[in-house]
């Protein structure tokens, strides 16, 4: 079974990784002058 601590750690890791993906994508999209739509 999954305990509360394991679930909390999994949720935190998922949230942090998604947040970092969004920040990384924003950084790449802003600093890419080749792709002007």
UniProtKB/Swiss-Prot annotation:
Cellular location(s): Endoplasmic reticulum; Endoplasmic reticulum membrane
UniProt topological domain (Cytoplasmic) ranges: 26-37
Segments in the Lumenal topological domain: 1-4
Keyword match Transit peptide: no
Domain of life: Eukaryota
Keyword Transmembrane: yes
Keywords annotated in UniProt: Endoplasmic reticulum, Membrane, Signal-anchor, Transmembrane, Transmembrane helix
Single GO biological process annotation from the record: protein N-linked glycosylation via asparagine
GO cellular component: endoplasmic reticulum membrane; oligosaccharyltransferase complex; oligosaccharyltransferase complex A; oligosaccharyltransferase complex B
Pfam families reported for this sequence: Ost4
TM ranges: 5-25
Associated pathway: Protein modification; protein glycosylation
Membrane topology, record value: Single-pass type III membrane protein
PANTHER family attached to this UniProt entry: DOLICHYL-DIPHOSPHOOLIGOSACCHARIDE--PROTEIN GLYCOSYLTRANSFERASE SUBUNIT 4 (PTHR48164:SF1)
Entry similarity comment: Belongs to the OST4 family.
Subunit and interaction comment: Component of the oligosaccharyltransferase (OST) complex. OST exists in two different complex forms which contain common core subunits RPN1, RPN2, OST48, OST4, DAD1 and TMEM258, either STT3A or STT3B as catalytic subunits, and form-specific accessory subunits. STT3A complex assembly occurs through the formation of 3 subcomplexes. Subcomplex 1 contains RPN1 and TMEM258, subcomplex 2 contains the STT3A-specific subunits STT3A, DC2/OSTC, and KCP2 as well as the core subunit OST4, and subcomplex 3 contains RPN2, DAD1, and OST48.
General function of this protein: Subunit of the oligosaccharyl transferase (OST) complex that catalyzes the initial transfer of a defined glycan (Glc(3)Man(9)GlcNAc(2) in eukaryotes) from the lipid carrier dolichol-pyrophosphate to an asparagine residue within an Asn-X-Ser/Thr consensus motif in nascent polypeptide chains, the first step in protein N-glycosylation. N-glycosylation occurs cotranslationally and the complex associates with the Sec61 complex at the channel-forming translocon complex that mediates protein translocation across the endoplasmic reticulum (ER). All subunits are required for a maximal enzyme activity.
Protein's name according to its UniProt entry: Dolichyl-diphosphooligosaccharide--protein glycosyltransferase subunit 4
Source organism (scientific name): Homo sapiens
Encoding gene, per UniProt annotation: OST4
């Amino acid at each position: 079974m999954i305990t509360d601590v394991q679930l909390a750690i999994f949720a935190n890791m998922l949230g942090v990784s998604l947040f970092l993906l969004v920040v990384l994508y924003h950084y790449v999209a802003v600093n890419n002058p080749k792709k002007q739509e």
